[in-house]
Amino acid sequence: MLKQIFIGLVVFYQRFISPLKAPSCRFYPTCSHYSLQALEKYGPVKGLWLTAARVLKCHPFHPGGYDPVK
């Protein structure tokens, strides 16, 4: 149940907030898609941990690139 809540929040972000912003994610898949994959694969605890680590890497001094959920 908790996993579905977090997935719903990410989907809400993708549908209603992300389109209002200019594309800025330096990674593929995007941070929100990465979050969905991490939540599906690992559940809410590890999925949120991986999402937080990924978002913290998303800054101008990191080169970005291909970074799949492992």
UniProtKB/Swiss-Prot annotation:
<comment type="function">
    <text>Could be involved in insertion of integral membrane proteins into the membrane.</text>
</comment>
<dbReference type="InterPro" id="IPR002696">
    <property type="entry name" value="Membr_insert_effic_factor_YidD"/>
</dbReference>
<keyword id="KW-1003">Cell membrane</keyword>
<keyword id="KW-0997">Cell inner membrane</keyword>
<protein>
    <recommendedName>
        <fullName>Putative membrane protein insertion efficiency factor</fullName>
    </recommendedName>
</protein>
<comment type="similarity">
    <text>Belongs to the UPF0161 family.</text>
</comment>
<dbReference type="GO" id="GO:0005886">
    <property type="term" value="C:plasma membrane"/>
</dbReference>
<dbReference type="Pfam" id="PF01809">
    <property type="entry name" value="YidD"/>
</dbReference>
<keyword id="KW-0472">Membrane</keyword>
